[in-house]
Amino acid sequence: MSLLTEVETLTRNGWECKCSDSSDPLIIAASIIGILHLILWILDRLFFKCIYRRLKYGLKRGPSTEGAPESMREEYRQEQQSAVDVDDVHFVNIELE
């Protein structure tokens, strides 16, 4: 059965689809896929900030220190902390008169 053979006609109750064989497995599969696509699209629009923020920033956690000796872990932590610490020497004090 071709989908082009379906006819939509206006009735008293609204638009209805008069299909000769609506139990066709292809039609059922297409309906299920369409409904799932709609649900996923709605969820994506509702939670896109959360999802994409997690993908963008959640995966950038740095290298794993699992399996490394404790001394190397401590050295790595100190390097990371020193990269974050602010050095007061680089600031310029401006005094307004």
Curated annotation (Swiss-Prot):
GO terms for biological process: protein complex oligomerization; symbiont genome entry into host cell via pore formation in plasma membrane; symbiont-mediated suppression of host autophagy. This is Matrix protein 2. The record marks W41 as: Seems to be involved in pH gating. It comes from Influenza A virus (strain A/Chicken/Pennsylvania/1/1983 H5N2). It is a single-pass type III membrane protein. It is found in: Virion membrane; Host apical cell membrane. Its main location: virion. GO terms for cellular component: host cell plasma membrane; membrane; virion membrane. Keywords: Disulfide bond, Host cell membrane, Host membrane, Host-virus interaction, Hydrogen ion transport, Inhibition of host autophagy by virus, Ion channel, Ion transport, Lipoprotein, Membrane, Palmitate, Phosphoprotein, Signal-anchor, Transmembrane, Transmembrane helix, Transport, Viral ion channel, Virion. Belongs to the influenza viruses matrix protein M2 family. Residues 1-22 are virion surface. The modification Phosphoserine is found at S64, S82. It holds the Pfam family Flu_M2. Forms a proton-selective ion channel that is necessary for the efficient release of the viral genome during virus entry. After attaching to the cell surface, the virion enters the cell by endocytosis. Acidification of the endosome triggers M2 ion channel activity. When the channel is activated, one or more imidazole moieties of His-37 probably become bi-protonated. Residues 60-83 are annotated as: Disordered. The record marks H37 as: Essential for channel activity, possibly by being protonated during channel activation, and by forming the channel gate and the selective filter. A lipid is attached at C50 (S-palmitoyl cysteine). Cytoplasmic tail plays an important role in virion assembly and morphogenesis.
